[in-house]
Amino acid sequence: RFKKIRRLGALPGLTSKRPRSGSDLKNQLRSGKRSQYRIRLEEKQKLRFHYGLTERQLLKYVHIAGKAKGSTGRVLLQLLEMRLDNILFRLGMASTIPGARQLVNHRHILVNGHIVDIPSYRCKPRDIITTKDKQRSKALIQNYIALSPHEELPNHLTIDPFQYKGLVNQIIDSKWIGLKIN
């Protein structure tokens, strides 16, 4: 993980740790001139590692975004941001996107009252995301919410930390996308 972060820069969804500034300077000196191919490849790898996607999953999302109206890049980022694992991360119910994926896979999360165990589930506006009524599920989410730094919540999401409930208000606005892609 840390090799990826050193190579590609800060990836907030992968870990909360940041690369040291000295290692970044060494990387730039050693690398020389960056070709267009290298820049595109690094940006693609940033997307893959930040959202925890395989190459095939990313290609499917690019294909869907290409068919949709609007800018392909912007639509692609909206599709990725509306995934269930990413929304849990943005709500502060998980410290990282891989942690959110594990919560979903272990069946701790309900969407509109139904258990969802697919991290790539595409959330829609007016979806209500809650935890199971089991004590263990609530304790996990409570720990994450208590430990997470209370950053500004994107305006397409609302959270009720006492009921462990999140709500998707609308499709994400492009200014709230957490990853800077060239």
Curated annotation (Swiss-Prot):
Q: Which SMART domains match?
A: Ribosomal_S4 (SM01390), S4 (SM00363)
Q: Might you name a Gene Ontology BP term for this protein? A: ribosomal small subunit biogenesis
Query: Could you cite one Gene Ontology molecular function of this protein?
Result: rRNA binding
Keyword entries, A-Z = Chloroplast, Plastid, Ribonucleoprotein, Ribosomal protein, RNA-binding, rRNA-binding
Q: Which GO terms describe its cellular component?
A: chloroplast; small ribosomal subunit
Q: Per its UniProt record, what InterPro entries does this chain match?
A: Ribosomal_uS4, Ribosomal_uS4_bac-type, Ribosomal_uS4_CS, Ribosomal_uS4_N, S4_RNA-bd, S4_RNA-bd_sf
Q: Where in the cell is it found?
A: Plastid, Chloroplast
Recorded hits in PROSITE patterns, A to Z, give:
RIBOSOMAL_S4, S4
Q: Where is the S4 RNA-binding domain?
A: 82-143
**Assembly and partners?**
Part of the 30S ribosomal subunit. Contacts protein S5. The interaction surface between S4 and S5 is involved in control of translational fidelity.
- Report the protein's function: One of the primary rRNA binding proteins, it binds directly to 16S rRNA where it nucleates assembly of the body of the 30S subunit. With S5 and S12 plays an important role in translational accuracy.
Q: Which family does it belong to?
A: Belongs to the universal ribosomal protein uS4 family.
Q: What is this protein called?
A: Small ribosomal subunit protein uS4c
Gene symbol here is rps4
